């Protein structure tokens, strides 16, 4: 099933600006481009890479000076050791920052995708609440007449009225939640007025994922090796070991080596936690698949019931209001199904992305 929707942020019923001009559209891809462009983290990484480039040029000059033939002095060996360490350090720092840039971009993609989904869901929820409130208002009008002629009790009438008031309060909460989501999205995009834009929904096609135990284990291992925290820790451990090997450490060398062993053990534990996190994500995906299949079954049953009720309505066996209620129930199942498919595909993208898979421990 291909779920393709366009959800507007120009609906006055939920507090969006209304304009006679042709609305501007904002795609997910464009939003990611803006988020990356505005990212202070990525700008900071770029500055670090520029600094590394400058440092490497200075190290090249030092290397040339130490390589001049005929020059020899007692400290030269220490200078070479320090130079080798500095070259290795800058090389690792460069690779780490390049990795960090890729990681940050992937995380931004993940964040913007989730915010697009959350905003769309909130817009659809508000539209759904509008329909439910309209139906409940009709129900209240009917109940008022029935109460006036003694067909229902005051308690029944008040219950319907209270339910309607509760729906209105929930709708207001949803509206405030939507405003919060919009502010969060614009924190990354920095547009002058996000309400001027129509967000183009990301299409999702429901495709269940199936992995063998070996494939799942392999994915978990790869994810544990590409996690940002793991890579950063390994980088630090490697540099500390190099300091020890080059006799550049201060203090007790044995204690320094023990610190390296401890850090290695901690990193192994972190990798194990990430692998377990990946497996939990996969288990949750399979549970969501079951929920989607159940919703699909309930949808088909509800459609059949609605067809039967249409026949009963024709012969006066049920009221038109009952048909409207059943249509609302079917609409709610359709919404739940669509929402579950999107949530599944979002979770699947997160799972398949080695940079972030298993990171929500």
Language model: regions and residue ranges:
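Sec-dependent N-terminal signal peptides of Gram-positive bacterial secreted proteins and lipoproteins
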Residues: 1-17
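Short flexible linkers and secondary-structure junctions
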Residues: 17-115, 237-241
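Short, charge/polar-rich alpha-helical segments
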Residues: 35-46, 112-126, 218-228, 278-292
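Sec/SRP-type N-terminal targeting helices
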Residues: 43-47, 75-105, 130, 155, ...
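Charged, solvent-exposed structural "stalk/scaffold" segments
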Residues: 52-54, 58, 79, 83-86, ...
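Coiled-coil heptad-register positions
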Residues: 53, 60, 67, 74, ...
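Short, solvent-exposed, mixed-charge loop/turn linkers that connect secondary-structure elements
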Residues: 175-217, 348-361
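Membrane-embedded hairpin module used as a gating/binding unit in multi-pass transport
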Residues: 195, 199-207, 221-247
């Amino acid at each position: 099933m291909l779920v393709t929707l366009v959800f507007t942020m120009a609906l006055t019923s939920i507090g969006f600006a209304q304009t006679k001009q042709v609305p501007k559209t904002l795609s997910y891809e464009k939003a990611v481009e803006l988020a990356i462009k505005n990212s202070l983290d990525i700008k900071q990484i770029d500055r670090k890479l520029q600094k590394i480039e400058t440092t490497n040029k200075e190290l090249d000059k030092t290397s040339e000076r130490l390589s001049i033939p005929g020059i020899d002095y007692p400290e030269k060996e220490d200078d070479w050791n320090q130079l080798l360490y500095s070259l290795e350090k800058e090389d690792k720092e460069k690779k780490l920052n390049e990795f960090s840039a890729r990681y940050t971009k992937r995380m931004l993609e993940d964040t913007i995708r989730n915010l697009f989904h959350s905003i769309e869901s909130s817009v659809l929820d508000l539209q759904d609440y509008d329909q439910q409130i309209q139906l409940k208002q009709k129900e209240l009008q009917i109940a008022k007449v029935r109460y006036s002629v003694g067909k229902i009790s005051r308690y029944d009438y008040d219950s319907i009225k209270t339910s309607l008031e509760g729906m209105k309060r929930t709708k207001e909460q949803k509206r405030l939640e939507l405003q919060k989501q919009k502010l969060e999205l614009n924190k990354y995009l920095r547009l002058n007025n996000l309400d001027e834009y129509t967000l183009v929904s990301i299409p999702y096609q429901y495709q269940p994922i199936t992995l063998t135990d070996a494939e799942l284990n392999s994915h978990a291992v790869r994810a544990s090796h590409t996690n940002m925290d793991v890579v950063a820790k390994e980088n630090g451990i490697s540099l500390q070991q190099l300091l020890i090997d080059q006799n550049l450490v201060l203090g007790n060398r044995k204690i320094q080596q023990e610190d390296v062993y401890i850090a290695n053990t901690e990193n192994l534990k972190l990798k194990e936690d990430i692998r377990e996190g990946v497996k939990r994500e996969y288990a949750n995906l399979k549970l969501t698949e079951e929920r989607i299949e159940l919703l699909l079954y309930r949808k088909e049953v509800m459609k059949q019931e609605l067809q039967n009720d249409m026949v009963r309505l024709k012969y006066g066996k049920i009221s038109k209001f009952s048909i409207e209620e059943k249509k609302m129930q079917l609409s709610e199942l359709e919404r739940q199904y669509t929402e579950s498919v999107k949530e599944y595909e979002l979770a699947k993208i997160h799972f398949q992305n080695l940079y972030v898979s298993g990171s929500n421990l």
